[in-house]
């Protein structure tokens, strides 16, 4: 009886053992067929137990990491001449390969991770060399993207608003073409560890319908390499050049057309009567002051540069024409009043000449009496053989031809007034013709010659 119970217990234990083993094998089979959870996979891929160290670059002590970059421009604007910078909002995308992040355990070909995972992986130390100010975007969440592919490729995208320096050459302003650059450089890794390069296709993309208030962003993009050499080593650098052509519509309406009308307004004084001194002087001074204000306004939004700009030449010539119109009336007024000065000069000359003439005649008469009476010669002794007196002969030989009759004051006044009117008539044609010639040279030089030089550069 005892042996039978022992045998039955043994059989029962054997059955339980095999059933447990079978259940464990079934559970193991189920667990093998079930995919790993994302949390477990990430812990295994880059957690503390994975051995991944974000402080060490991929291929440590090996070949440099090649980082492919591209940018997508969301907005481009706020180009300031005074501070010589521009503002741009972009998506910056960087791609590189990290063999430590390659996987086969997870079924998906790529993983889109939360931005908080960025602190767990290695990232390039990219910075913008010509950056003056920048900020990230966090509304409604951090505008960052992290994607890891099965082969270890990493895509890191971030949205940034940048204020970048843009040195400008304003000699042709406002008909200029500016070139603004964006430089992407490594801060700490030399070219032995890290190399930046532009993406082969679509390195620089622009949002559809992107427009600028005063410029046209040209479609061709100039992509270059700008390797930097410092005391600490040779660092990788890439740059994109944006060519911006300024539109003249605003400046035509605000500067060129008003100044042109002011110059034309100053020519009205040539048709106003020269006797209307208050009208002509008031018009001349008003146009000069208005032109001065217009010229100052054109320089208010520009930096204080040492060279001459195209707008400076235009404003200076317009001011010169307006001021010359005012001086023209001064010349006309001076010429029209010259007859009064001439009459005053004649009166002074006649006043000084009359006493001298009387004195000369008295001396001449006194000398005659002395000569003839001293030698006892009377008037009869001065008769010649032909009956002509000596004195009469002398007078006939020394008399000058009679002077031309002088013009009357009224005739002189009319003569000088005609001369003044002639100056006005010449100015009516000369000023517009001179301004037209200046315009021809000005627009040909700045719209054709200078622009071709810029394109050739």
Swiss-Prot record:
Keyword Nucleotidyltransferase belongs to the record: no
Transmembrane segments: 251-272, 278-298, 310-330, 426-446
Binding positions for Zn(2+) per the UniProt entry: 220, 222, 243
Topology of this chain in the membrane: Multi-pass membrane protein
Localisation: Postsynaptic cell membrane; Synapse; Perikaryon; Cell projection, Dendrite
Marked site (Important for obstruction of the ion pore in the closed conformation) residue numbers: 289
Activity regulation description: Channel opening is triggered by extracellular glycine. Channel characteristics depend on the subunit composition; heteropentameric channels are activated by lower glycine levels and display faster desensitization.
Residues bound to glycine 2: 232
Binding of glycine 1, residues: 93, 157
Assigned protein family: Belongs to the ligand-gated ion channel (TC 1.A.9) family. Glycine receptor (TC 1.A.9.3) subfamily. GLRA1 sub-subfamily.
Description of how the protein assembles with itself and partners: Interacts with GLRB to form heteropentameric channels; this is probably the predominant form in vivo. Heteropentamer composed of four GLRA1 subunits and one GLRB subunit. Heteropentamer composed of two GLRA1 and three GLRB. Heteropentamer composed of three GLRA1 and two GLRB. Homopentamer (in vitro). Both homopentamers and heteropentamers form functional ion channels, but their characteristics are subtly different.
Function: Subunit of heteromeric glycine-gated chloride channels. Plays an important role in the down-regulation of neuronal excitability. Contributes to the generation of inhibitory postsynaptic currents. Channel activity is potentiated by ethanol. Potentiation of channel activity by intoxicating levels of ethanol contribute to the sedative effects of ethanol.
Name of protein: Glycine receptor subunit alpha-1
Source species of the chain: Bos taurus
Gene name of the encoded protein: GLRA1
């Amino acid at each position: 009886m005892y042996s039978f119970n022992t045998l039955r217990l043994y059989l029962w234990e054997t059955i339980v053992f095999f059933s447990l083993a079978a259940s464990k094998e079934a559970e193991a089979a189920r667990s093998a067929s079930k995919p790993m959870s994302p949390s477990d996979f990430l812990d295994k891929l880059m957690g503390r137990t994975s051995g991944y160290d974000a402080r060490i670059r991929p291929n440590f002590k090996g070949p440099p990491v090649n980082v492919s970059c591209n940018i997508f421009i969301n907005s481009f604007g706020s180009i300031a001449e005074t501070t010589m910078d521009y503002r741009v909002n972009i998506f910056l995308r960087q791609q590189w390969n990290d063999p430590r992040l390659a996987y086969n355990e997870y079924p998906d070909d790529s993983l889109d991770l939360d931005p908080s995972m960025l602190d767990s992986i290695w990232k390039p130390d990219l910075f913008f060399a010509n950056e003056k100010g920048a900020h990230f975007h966090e509304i409604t969440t951090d505008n960052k993207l992290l994607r890891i592919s099965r082969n270890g490729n990493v895509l890191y995208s971030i949205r940034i608003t940048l204020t970048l320096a843009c040195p400008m050459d304003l000699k042709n302003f406002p008909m200029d073409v500016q070139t603004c650059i964006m430089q992407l450089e490594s801060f700490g890794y030399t070219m032995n560890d890290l190399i930046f390069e532009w993406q082969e296709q679509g390195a620089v993309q622009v949002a559809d319908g992107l427009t600028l208030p005063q410029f046209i962003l040209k479609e061709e993009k100039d992509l270059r390499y700008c390797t930097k050499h410092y005391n600490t080593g040779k660092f990788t650098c890439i740059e994109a050049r944006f060519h911006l052509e300024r539109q003249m519509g605003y400046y035509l309406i605000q500067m060129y057309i008003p100044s042109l009308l002011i110059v034309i307004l100053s020519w009205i004084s040539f048709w106003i009567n020269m006797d209307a001194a208050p009208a002509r002087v008031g018009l001349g001074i008003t146009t000069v002051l208005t032109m001065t204000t217009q010229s100052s306004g054109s320089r208010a939004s520009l930096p204080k540069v040492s060279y001459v700009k195209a707008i400076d030449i235009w404003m200076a010539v317009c001011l010169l024409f307006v001021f010359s119109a005012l001086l023209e009336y001064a010349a006309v007024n001076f010429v029209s009043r010259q007859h009064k000065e001439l009459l005053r000069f004649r009166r002074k000359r006649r006043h000084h000449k009359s006493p001298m003439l009387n004195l000369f005649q008295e001396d001449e008469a006194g000398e005659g009496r002395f000569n003839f009476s001293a030698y006892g010669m009377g008037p009869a002794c001065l008769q010649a053989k032909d009956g002509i007196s000596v004195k009469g002969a002398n007078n006939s030989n020394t008399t000058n031809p009679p002077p031309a009759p002088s013009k009357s004051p009224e005739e002189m006044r009319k003569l000088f007034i005609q001369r003044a009117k002639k100056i006005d008539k010449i100015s009516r044609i000369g000023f517009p013709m001179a301004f037209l010639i200046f315009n021809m040279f000005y627009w040909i030089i700045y719209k054709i010659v200078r622009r071709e030089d810029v394109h050739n550069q």
